[in-house]
């Protein structure tokens, strides 16, 4: 009550922030008459002037009003577009490192030019992150005219571009690209074998377009660079023949071999199913010994393949989750409906789907590098974003990224009419109503956009419309090459456009069609008369569409997130235009079937509803929204769970990448090698001759054999012990250390100091990379089974953290030992041979990258769903970690980032 009273008196936090920013808008507007009087040359000279003022100590906030006024005037002259006052507010919100929620059609692309220009003046690089390559190139080309005119350089990064072009793009003041490309380039940079092979500078400032899509929808799927493993794909094909012989249970307690957990996207074998599967696998010769059982240690690989095959057959559907194109299985993005060419599911799922579809099965992949979007974007010194729908996820943005959402008012009032949902008994009744609504709109000349949740639904609707003689366009994963053209024409009178989910985001649907697109077809040489005719025709169509009611949105199914539904609705009613929306639902829709309360379904059946009967009731709509909230909470738990696990990996990743940076920057790593050699030899001797031990406890024969096999150094330690009666463990350790040091000194004298320095650096880098790759594979295996610890009354996250630390420590010890072993045994005659070795390794690394896959991993691989369900209310709440934007270098006396409590130099800094 007190809160609501205070809000009425002082306004909400959002309103208070808008009032503060409006004061700055007044300052910017006051500067406009002065800025307008400047010549082009004087206006362009403002950029170097701002840079000098920043260099002299002025802050960005101090020069913001004048810089925004300059950018607005330059935009008017170059692009013919002047920023509205609400767009100035949006630009300030982005500069402050917050999220600006702006409705569709409010000009987010133009808004971004203000903070991009201001922050690019610092010369440390600004990244503008988009959802697809088309938008990155389009915005870089369009807005690049403005930035170039103002004296700033612009680059765009995209997959497959030449190395030199990518270097130049990242060196530019402003770089456009997709979230995936920025993420993969970060990982590639940390696999580079020399400084010259790296692209990115320090991650300074990023503006994320469609921030909800990138930081929330895609946050469940880590970015992974993986290469083919050695295992043959034949087992996937053999196991695939088994699965169709297993029967599905209708419920967890019903009869059959397996049941499906649709919420968690998992398949579980029943007791009977395990026995039946074992029998079938034995008959197929896949299991060799009937006494061992399916879950014997030697059969775990078979279990992995069987689980993947069950998920491929029972959960993943063709033309919904993937399509088959040119003999390949191509993933369909569940949020945008776009195909993700070149991406592969991990954990054997992609191979299982390939076997199911009868296309060539490619080898399973091994992780080479990975990172989540949460940890990637939290590395930026300053992060901001913009979208039409963020307020429903404000808590997640704040708790995970430290980003506040500010809702920006529209330039003109929204007049779109959102009709109540219509709920039908089954899908047939629902689609009959959808088709009737489409035909009615087409007859009246009202354009309609139909949103579907799958390719299958869009093609089914398309077939019905074709039979009814209704002209239409389909925009889904199979047609996304024509995406911009289809969306540009979706506002024509009577146009019918069927779109999978939110494909086509980033391009406004203009009532009457896109005037700019028609001008573009005319060309720059067109006469004024021709342009006038085009404008007159467009205005006539525009007025006709407005009279018919504007764009009508039809949703054929509620998405599991209210935000995605709001995005679809938001395509209509842009900039004060008329528009309308309606969702058609049925009890057979996934959301209703899995999550909606049973009483809704029972009530509708008890009322004797027929196929074409419809319910329009606010109570039902509230139940649907309640179901969506349940799913949103469930998905937030999954994303939070994923982040908790990846934070462990991230601490280790930071240590390894920091050490790689030190190695790449160092002129010489001799001191590192000398320190490592002392540690390795001490540990080696201690294994066979423990400190402070007596000679009866020594194993000199084992020590001699190990020195010869690992270091290539024969030492007669037993003879030494016979001749020196007073010899103790410390003296033996000193003798071995002296001999090894002499061996390394001889090697250096033979090849020269420069050659030895180059060799040491090359070996340390190569061994560290190989050790990290093998460690990632072990972490994958650990993560996949860690949730089972919950059954033993242990906290999986704590167990994961503890065992991950042990694996990491073991990996670093192995790396140190391998570095010394290699340096002791390698035979190099000249510096040219080292250079040739480095060049060969670089070529192999490039070949591995070309052969590698850039993919999103299914979040289920983290055991996320299982653990979330087990831990609800069972674990102590996990505190939200403070978001750290900037990552200072870890000092040698600082606490180690791994969390051991030791100093960095005594823990994971020992390798440095």
Swiss-Prot record:
Keyword annotations: ATP-binding, Cell inner membrane, Cell membrane, Cytoplasm, Membrane, Metal-binding, Nucleotide-binding, Protein transport, Translocase, Translocation, Transport, Zinc
Membrane topology label: Peripheral membrane protein
Binding site for ATP: 87, 105-109, 508
Subcellular localization(s) per the UniProt record: Cell inner membrane; Cytoplasm
GO BP annotation list: intracellular protein transmembrane transport; protein import; protein targeting; protein transport by the Sec complex
Record family assignment: Belongs to the SecA family.
Gene Ontology cellular-component terms listed: cell envelope Sec protein transport complex; cytosol; plasma membrane
EC number, UniProt record: 7.4.2.8
Cofactor names: Zn(2+)
Single annotated GO MF: protein-exporting ATPase activity
Subunit structure: Monomer and homodimer. Part of the essential Sec protein translocation apparatus which comprises SecA, SecYEG and auxiliary proteins SecDF-YajC and YidC.
Protein name as it appears in the record: Protein translocase subunit SecA
């Amino acid at each position: 009550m007190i809160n609501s009273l205070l809000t009425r008196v002082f306004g909400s936090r959002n309103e208070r922030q808008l009032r503060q920013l409006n004061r700055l808008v007044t300052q910017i507007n006051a500067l406009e008459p002065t800025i307008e009087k400047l010549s082009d040359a004087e206006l362009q000279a403002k950029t170097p002037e701002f840079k000098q003022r920043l260099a002299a100590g002025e802050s960005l906030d101090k020069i913001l009003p004048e810089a925004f006024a300059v950018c607005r005037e330059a935009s008017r002259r170059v692009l013919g577009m002047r920023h509205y006052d609400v767009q100035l507010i949006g630009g300030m919100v982005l500069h402050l490192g917050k999220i600006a929620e702006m409705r569709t059609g409010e000009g987010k692309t133009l808004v971004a030019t203000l903070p991009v220009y201001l922050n690019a003046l610092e010369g440390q690089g600004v990244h503008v992150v988009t959802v697809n390559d088309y938008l990155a190139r389009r915005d870089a080309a369009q807005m690049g005219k403005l930035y170039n005119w103002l004296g700033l350089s612009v680059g765009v990064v995209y997959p497959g571009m030449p190395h030199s072009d990518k270097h130049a793009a990242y060196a530019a003041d402003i770089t456009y690209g997709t979230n995936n490309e920025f993420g993969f380039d970060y990982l590639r940079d940390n696999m580079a074998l020399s400084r010259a092979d790296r692209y990115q500078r320090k991650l300074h400032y990023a503006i994320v377009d469609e921030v909800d899509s990138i930081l929330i929808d895609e946050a469940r799927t880590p970015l992974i660079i993986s290469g083919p493993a050695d295992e043959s794909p034949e087992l996937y094909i053999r196991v695939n023949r088994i699965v169709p012989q297993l029967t599905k249970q209708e419920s967890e307690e019903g009869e059959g071999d397996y049941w499906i957990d649709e919420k968690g996207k998992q398949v579980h074998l029943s007791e009977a199913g395990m026995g039946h599967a074992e029998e079938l696998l034995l008959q197929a010769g896949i299991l060799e010994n009937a006494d061992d059982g399916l879950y014997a240690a030697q059969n775990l690989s078979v279990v992995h393949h069987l689980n993947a095959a069950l998920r491929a057959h029972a959960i993943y559907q063709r033309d919904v989750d993937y399509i088959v194109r040119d003999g390949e299985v191509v993933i369909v993005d569940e949020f945008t409906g776009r195909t993700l060419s070149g991406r592969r599911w991990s954990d054997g799922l992609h191979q299982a789907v390939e076997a199911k579809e009868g296309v060539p099965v490619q080898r399973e992949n091994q992780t080479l590098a990975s990172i989540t979007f949460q940890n990637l974007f939290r590395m930026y010194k300053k992060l901001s974003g913009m979208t039409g729908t963020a307020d429903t996820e404000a808590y997640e943005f704040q708790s995970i990224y430290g980003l506040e959402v500010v809702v920006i008012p529209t330039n003109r009032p929204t007049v779109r009419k959102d009709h109540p949902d219509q709920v039908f008994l089954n899908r047939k009744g629902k689609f009959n109503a959808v088709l009737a609504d489409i035909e009615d709109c087409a007859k009246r000349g009202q354009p309609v956009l139909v949103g579907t949740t799958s390719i299958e639904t869009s093609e089914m609707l398309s077939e019905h419309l074709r039979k009814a003689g209704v002209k239409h366009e389909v925009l889904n994963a199979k047609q996304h090459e024509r995406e911009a053209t289809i969306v540009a024409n979706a506002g024509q009178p009577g146009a019918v456009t069927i779109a999978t989910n939110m494909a086509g985001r980033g391009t406004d649907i203009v009532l009457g069609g896109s005037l700019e697109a028609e001008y573009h077809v005319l060309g720059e040489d067109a006469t004024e008369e021709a342009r006038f005719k085009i404008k007159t025709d467009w205005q006539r169509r525009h007025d006709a569409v407005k009279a018919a009611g504007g764009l009508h949105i039809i949703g054929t199914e509620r998405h599991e997130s209210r935000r995605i539904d709001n995005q679809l609705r938001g395509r209509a009613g842009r900039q004060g235009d008329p528009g309308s929306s309606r969702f058609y639902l049925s009890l057979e829709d996934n959301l209703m079937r899995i999550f909606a309360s049973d009483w809704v379904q029972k009530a509708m059946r008890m009322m004797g509803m027929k196929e074409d009967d419809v319910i329009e009731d606010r109570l039902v709509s509230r139940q649907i929204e309640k179901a969506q909230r349940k799913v949103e909470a469930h998905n937030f738990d999954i994303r939070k769970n994923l982040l908790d696990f990846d934070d462990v990996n991230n601490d280790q990743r930071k240590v390894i990448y920091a050490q790689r940076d030190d190695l790449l920057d160092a002129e010489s790593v001799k001191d590192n090698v000398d320190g490592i050699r002392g540690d390795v030899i001490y540990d080696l001797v201690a294994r066979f001759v423990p400190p402070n031990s007596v000679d009866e406890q020594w194993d000199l024969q084992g020590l001699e054999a190990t020195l010869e096999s690992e270091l290539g150094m024969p030492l007669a330690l037993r003879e030494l012990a016979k001749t020196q009666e007073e010899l103790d463990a410390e003296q033996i350790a000193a003798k071995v250390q002296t001999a090894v040091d002499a061996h390394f000194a001889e090697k250096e004298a033979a090849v020269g100091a420069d050659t030895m320095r180059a060799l040491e650096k090359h070996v340390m880098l190569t061994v560290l990379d190989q050790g990290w790759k093998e460690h990632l594979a072990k972490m994958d295996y650990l993560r996949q089974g860690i949730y089972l610890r919950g059954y033993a009354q242990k906290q999986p996250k704590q167990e994961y953290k503890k065992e991950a630390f042990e694996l990491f420590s073991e990996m670093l010890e192995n790396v140190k030992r391998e570095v010394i072993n290699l340096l002791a045994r390698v035979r190099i005659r000249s510096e040219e041979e080292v250079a040739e070795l480095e060049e060969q390794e670089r070529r192999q690394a490039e070949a591995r990258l070309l052969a590698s896959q850039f993919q999103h991993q299914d979040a289920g691989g983290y055991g996320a769903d299982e653990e979330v369900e087990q831990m609800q209310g069972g674990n102590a709440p996990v505190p939200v970690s403070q978001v750290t934007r900037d990552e200072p270098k870890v000092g040698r006396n600082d606490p180690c980032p791994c969390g051991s409590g030791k100093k960095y130099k005594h823990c994971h800094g020992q390798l440095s």
